């Protein structure tokens, strides 16, 4: 584990321990609504404080971009951390174990390091550009399925901005008719890690934020998968529209999506 990932993991583990304690008494967790179906809790905020303080101490010249508190550090910094202190807040608040801490490091705008930590399972996904992806120190690879009708596809519903719900449901209906099934588990970082391990053969979602997808996308890429936007291009981090899959089914997924967008 290189120094960047070591620092990230130590901070994520501390934040994860705090989450596990909080999960034992959810009635005491204070929650606010940022928008319709978009919640934030004091657990999100406390996790972010732990992560930001650790990164600032280790790397005072790095920029840090967070879901809850925005940007820290110089805008022109060569290194930038993108972190989601609690991906899957709604899951967490309902006692569902599918939530994670997501941390990615960019150098001059290029993803270099990624860590996704799932506290309930104590699962640590990580990747370094050009060096592969790991789950709990074991190398992971995307699936090798070819036929779409044998593939399991992950996705996420557009519950915050529902303006494109009809279009999304048309896409989902098409996928459900042509695949082995779909899953909506509520934490994009872990959905992407599921692609990286082969548990999902593909994943798609619209209108996500950089902290939702930056770390998971690099983990998919380093596990042998491909990540694109809905047009098959490389603009997914900017647009928030993402498709991730093993190389053998990506084109089939894009064909279905393109018929509706």
Curated annotation (Swiss-Prot):
| GO molecular-function terms, A-Z | inositol monophosphate 1-phosphatase activity; metal ion binding; RNA binding
What cystine pairs are annotated?
none
Q: Which UniProt keywords apply?
A: Chaperone, Cytoplasm, Hydrolase, Magnesium, Metal-binding, Ribosome biogenesis, RNA-binding, Transcription, Transcription antitermination, Transcription regulation
Compartment(s): Cytoplasm
The residues that hold Mg(2+) are 67, 84, 86
Question: Which top-level enzyme class is recorded in the Swiss-Prot or TrEMBL entry?
Answer: hydrolase
Residue ranges annotated as transmembrane are none
State where substrate binds.
Answer: 67, 86-89, 183, 212
Q: What is its EC number?
A: 3.1.3.25
Q: Which InterPro entries match?
A: IMPase, Inositol_monoP_metal-BS, Inositol_monophosphatase-like, Inositol_monophosphatase_CS, Inositol_monophosphatase_SuhB
Keyword match Chaperone: yes
* UniProt family annotation: Belongs to the inositol monophosphatase superfamily.
Note the PANTHER family from the entry: INOSITOL MONOPHOSPHATASE, INOSITOL-1-MONOPHOSPHATASE-RELATED
Note the subunit structure.
Homodimer. The rRNA transcription and antitermination complex (rrnTAC) consists of RNA polymerase (RNAP), NusA, NusB, NusE (rpsJ), NusG, SubB, ribosomal protein S4, DNA and precursor rRNA; S4 is more flexible than other subunits.
What the protein does? Might be part of the processive rRNA transcription and antitermination complex (rrnTAC). The complex forms an RNA-chaperone ring around the RNA exit tunnel of RNA polymerase (RNAP). It supports rapid transcription and antitermination of rRNA operons, cotranscriptional rRNA folding, and annealing of distal rRNA regions to allow correct ribosome biogenesis. This subunit may play a central role in organizing the structure.
Protein name (Swiss-Prot/TrEMBL): Putative Nus factor SuhB
């Amino acid at each position: 584990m290189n120094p960047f990932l070591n620092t990230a993991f130590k901070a994520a583990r501390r934040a994860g321990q705090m989450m596990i304690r909080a999960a034992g008494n959810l009635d005491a967790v204070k929650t606010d609504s940022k928008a319709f179906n978009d919640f934030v809790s004091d657990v999100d905020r406390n996790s972010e404080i732990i992560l930001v303080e650790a990164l600032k101490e280790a790397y005072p010249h790095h920029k840090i971009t967070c879901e809850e508190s925005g940007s820290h550090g110089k805008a022109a910094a060569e290194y930038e951390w993108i972190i989601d202190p609690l991906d899957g807040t709604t899951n967490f608040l309902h006692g569902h174990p599918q939530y994670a801490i997501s941390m990615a490091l960019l150098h001059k705008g290029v993803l270099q390091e990624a860590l996704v930590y799932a506290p309930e399972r104590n699962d640590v996904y990580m990747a370094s550009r050009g060096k592969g992806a790991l789950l709990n120190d074991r190398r992971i690879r995307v699936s090798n399925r070819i036929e779409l009708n044998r593939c399991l596809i992950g996705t996420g519903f557009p519950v915050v901005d529902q303006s494109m719900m009809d279009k999304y449901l048309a896409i989902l209906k098409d996928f459900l008719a042509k695949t082995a099934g779909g899953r909506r588990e509520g934490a994009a970082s872990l959905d992407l890690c599921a692609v990286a391990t082969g548990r999902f053969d593909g994943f798609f979602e619209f209108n996500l934020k950089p902290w939702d997808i930056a770390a998971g996308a690099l983990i998919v890429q380093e596990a042998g998968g491909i990540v694109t936007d809905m047009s098959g291009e490389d603009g997914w981090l900017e647009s928030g529209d993402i498709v991730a899959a093993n190389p053998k089914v990506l084109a089939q997924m894009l064909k279905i999506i393109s018929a509706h967008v």
